Amino acid sequence: MLGWALIFLIVAIIAGTLGFSGVAGAASWIAQVLFLVFLALLVISLLGGRRV
């Protein structure tokens, strides 16, 4: 249990430093772009209608 607590502490520290720098904004923008790309691919595949 102590090992897991230390791992989560390290992950929380890394996430905190990335959140307070400027990396979080860039990661959010990349996530939005990827969401739109995969949403477009979903719509195209649904409209294509070919079953595999």
Swiss-Prot record:
It is a multi-pass membrane protein. Coiled coil: none annotated. It is found in: Cell membrane. InterPro entries: DUF1328. GO terms for cellular component: plasma membrane. Keywords: Cell membrane, Membrane, Transmembrane, Transmembrane helix. The keyword Cell membrane applies. The keyword Membrane applies. The chain crosses the membrane at residues 4-24, 29-49. It comes from the Bacteria. Belongs to the UPF0391 family. This is UPF0391 membrane protein Tgr7_2500. The lineage of its organism: Bacteria, Pseudomonadati, Pseudomonadota, Gammaproteobacteria, Chromatiales.
